[in-house]
Every structure is written in C-alpha cells, then in structure tokens.
Amino acid sequence: MGGAKSSQPVQKPEFYKSKQSFYLPFAWAWFRRRGKAGTISLYPEKETTGGRGRPRIKREVYGMKEHKITRRNFLKVGAAASAVGMLSAAPAAQAAAPAAEAAEENCLDWLFQKPKYIFLFIGDGMGTAQIQSARFYKGTTENNGAITEGELSFTAFPEVGSVTTYDSTSFCPDSASTATSIATGNKTESGVINMCPWTRDVPYETIAEKLHKQKNYKVGVISSVNIDHATPAAFYAHQSSRKNYYQIGVELANSGFEYFAGGEFQKVNGDGTGPNNHEVAAQAGYNVVTTQAGAAALTSGAGKTLIIAEALADGKAMNYAMDAAPGEWQLTDYVRKGMELLDNGRGFFLMTESGKIDWACHANDAAASIHDVLEMSNAVQAAVEFYNNHPNETLILVTADHETGGMAIGYKTTNYDTFLTNLTHQKMSYAKFDSTYVERYIAEKTPFETAMADVKANFGLTLPTDPDAANAGKLLLTDYEVENLRKAYERTLEVGASGQSKMSQQDYELYGTYIPFSMAVCHTINHKSGMDHTTYAHTGAMVNLYAMGVGAEKFRGVFDNTEIYHKLAELTGVQ
C-alpha cells in the first residue's frame, strides 16, 4: 500500500445559482451570524493536475479574486445572478423546475453544511523548514540536482494559516501541552495532558470525545510513535503527567474510540500487578492486532480495533520511513485502513500523528526528517483521494504541534549554496546506525578507521586516505571534519553503555543526549548538504496549517493553536 499517488483532480464544491433572490436574505443573515462578512472567495478555485498525477490547486479563482463581502456587494452579486437567471430560464422554466429545485437544495446544503469526515494530521516538530527541506529535496532529487522545489500533497491546499504554539509555561512548549491546545482549546503546562494548569485537577474534554459523544462520529487515532505518546494521548486521555503511560493506556481502552494504530505502549505491563495494556483493551471489547497480516485482514464491521505495528524500532515506535523494509506498513497504510474501518453514514474524525519527524529533529537527523515528511505527504494524499469522492463532506487539516531542532536551510561553510543531493547517500537513520553498528563498536572497541568504512557505506562520507577519495566529490572529509569525527568516536567509546550520565556540558552542547559519534556523523553530512540545527529540543517558532474542504476558509490567517479546536467546534456544532 503505502502512499500511492492520486490521478484524480481535487474536486471543489460547486455554487448553485437558481432562484438565488429568494434565499439572499437568509444567506446574508447566515454569513453575518457566522462571521462571514469579511474576506471570502465567492467562486470555486481552479484546479489542475500537477506533475506525476498529483492534484495541484492553484490559488486563483474564476471570474474574480477575493472581495470584501458587504451587504451591498452581496446583494449586487445576487441580484445580477437572479436577473440573468430569470432572463435565460424563462422559456424553459416549467421543464427546468425539478433541476432548479435540486440546485436550490444543493446551494442551501453548501451554505449550511458541516464536515462529515474530518482528517487532522499533526506533523510533530514539523516547522516550515522541515516542510521546505522536504520540498527542496524532492524537487532537486527528481530533477537531476536542479534548484527547484517539489510539491507535497498538502502544500497544494487552498487555505494556509500560521499558528502560535506557546503554552502556559514556555514559549518553547512540549507535545503534551500543544496537543492539549489543539484538542481542547485550552493552554496548559508542558508535560500535562488535558488538565488545567497549575492545579491539574480539572480535565478538559477533547474535540474527539465531543464528536464521539454528541455527534456519534466514529473516532480514530494513529501515530508513528507510541500510541500512548503525548500527541495521540491528548485526544483521549487526561493526565497530570504525560509519563503516566500505563494510566494513559487504560484511558485509551475506556475511550470507546473505534480505531487506534501505532507503536507499542511504553509501559505495557504497568507495575506488573494487573493486566497489561493489551489485556485492558481486549477486556474493553477491542480487537488487539499485533501483526501486519492481521491488520490487512481487517474489514469494515470489525468493531473497535487496536493495531500495534508489527515492525518496531527505537523506543518501540514504528520505523523511520527511510528504515522501513519493502512492504512494511507505514503511516499511509494505517490511514487507509482507518478510513476503511471508520467509514459510515454518521461521519468520522481521524487524527494522524507523524511523530518521528520530531524524533529525527531532536537528533538533528535532517535526512530522516525529510523522509518522514515525505511519508506524511503520502498519508495526506490518501485522505485527498477520500476527499475526491466526498468533496462536499470532507475537511482535511495538516499542521504541527511545534517546531523541533531549530532546523535551518543554509550553513556557514556552504555560504549561499545547498547540496541536498548529498543526503541521498544517507541510507539509514541515526537510530538504525546506532543499533546496527555503534553498539557493536562500543562492545568490541572497533578501530576508528574500520568504523569510518561503515560511515562511507551508509552516509557517503569519505576519509582523505580512502583509496576512493578522488571520487568522493563534496562528501570528501576535510582534516577538520575528520578530527571532529575522531573526537566524537573516542568519546563514544569512553562513555560506552553508561550514556549521558558521564557526559559533560560540553558533550551535551555538541551531541545532546545522543551517542556522540552518530551525532557527529549527522552533523557532518547536514553541514555538507547546507543544513543545520540550533538545538536538540523544541523552539518557539510558529507553524503552518494547511486546510482543504468544508470550512477550510476558517483556517486562513494568523491565530493561536487553541483556535484550531474552537474553529472545529464551531464547524461541527459541538458544545
């Protein structure tokens, strides 16, 4: 499965013009009541098909651009349309009556419609640099190194907003507090999930819970990291600490949501005195599926389902996209399965987190981040294909909870140049390099030169003394870079399995809480590609929100992350 491109053009709701004069007062009152007397496009946007069959939505409109909607202009447009309609329709008025009535009904449906199918994608840590680096990488690698950007499925969406992310305690928030803001419309402290700040004694109900209870929507939650991690948990759990993993797992089972998929619970056995999280879910009526074949066999009508990915990697999360084996399910596959299991006449809400973008950026692994953004784009494309079949009932939102790593496109030693094609030589994430190679180096005290042969094979970085040095191009290491790598390698062997407990402040500034050698390798290939990071933590940068579908226009402009909840609540009518 995994991210097939759609060849269908993106469809937009049509405007219907028959007998508009009768409905103009009602429509105007509705626009006023809903706060629509601002800037709004009256006509559907043009569509074309982008390269490789991708839908590409151009931000231009038929007939007119955007206009300030006043009562006078609103009535002018309506009166003109009514006059034209009466003159042209008079000879065949009787024959056209049934079609006109149907058009009226469709027009009213469009004016008052609410999204029946809601997709919310959260790229954890996905700031604008993460998105743009993926676009640049895609464009240059698909065009023989040319300086051109590629399109992602969601960067073609017609509406774009900019979102602030700070929480009650910091301008550089964490995922628990930011996901709480998105899910409930409330600020809280870093590390707290859906509880009021400071006292932590009042739970906040989430948009997913309200849609489930008040509107009978089916609900799904997907994450490429642990299913009880902060972001997915913020749609079903209420905890004073994001580290209450077992209790979060119990809340998952008690939520009654119809579909969960992702990595393993972080403390699946709790304190060992009670049932594990799998057993708790099964007792609550969930089908607990732990194999890919079992997940593939699920069909609509399967009932409440919890899928734990079969192929687990670092931290019992799903693999980075660049590390996934051929045929291994990725985010796209779980989105497709979620759509299949959730689709129903009442509607659904599906939250999907690409959590390993954040993990990659914490580790300053630019290539891993890029590949996970590209995989998230594939997952969004699956939702776009669903939208194409339900254009008047579907809303797709793509955003981030915060930015991670302070990613920058541009580096001191490359000046105004970037060489993103260098990143094609990186064959695996830092995490897979650690588990496949570095753990063995530590155990066996492998010589530096031997380790560098593996670095060449998996990252392309080549020592000046290598027999193939003349063919290394821009990945040939300078003496300065070799010395930095050697120091990091020696420090790795010194620290060994004890990890950060023996690391100094200087170590932290150089390598964060990660294995020094792996970080030095990532930094080196990043810098040679023209990329850098400022931190191993989160930043306070604004993030983008991309929207398409019913109510998408509400998400344009600049607003706080709490407004995402409030806009969704207004659109769906939950209290």
Name every feature range the model reports, one short phrase each.
Residues S6-P9, P13-F15, Q20-S21:
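Cationic, low-complexity basic patches in intrinsically disordered or flexible, solvent-exposed regions
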Residues S21-W30, G35-N73, V77-L87, A95-A96:
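N-terminal secretory signal peptides
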Residues A89-I118:
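C-terminal segment of N-terminal export signals and the immediately downstream linker at the start
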Residues K114-Q130, R135, T199-Q214:
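Active-site-adjacent structural elements in enzyme catalytic domains
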Residues P115-Y117, M126-I131, F136-T180, H229-Q575:
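A post-motif C-terminal structural segment
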Residues S170, D174-W198:
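A glycine- and small-residue-enriched flexible loop/hinge segment at structural boundaries
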Residues K187-V250:
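Extracytoplasmic mature domains of secreted/periplasmic and thylakoid-lumen proteins
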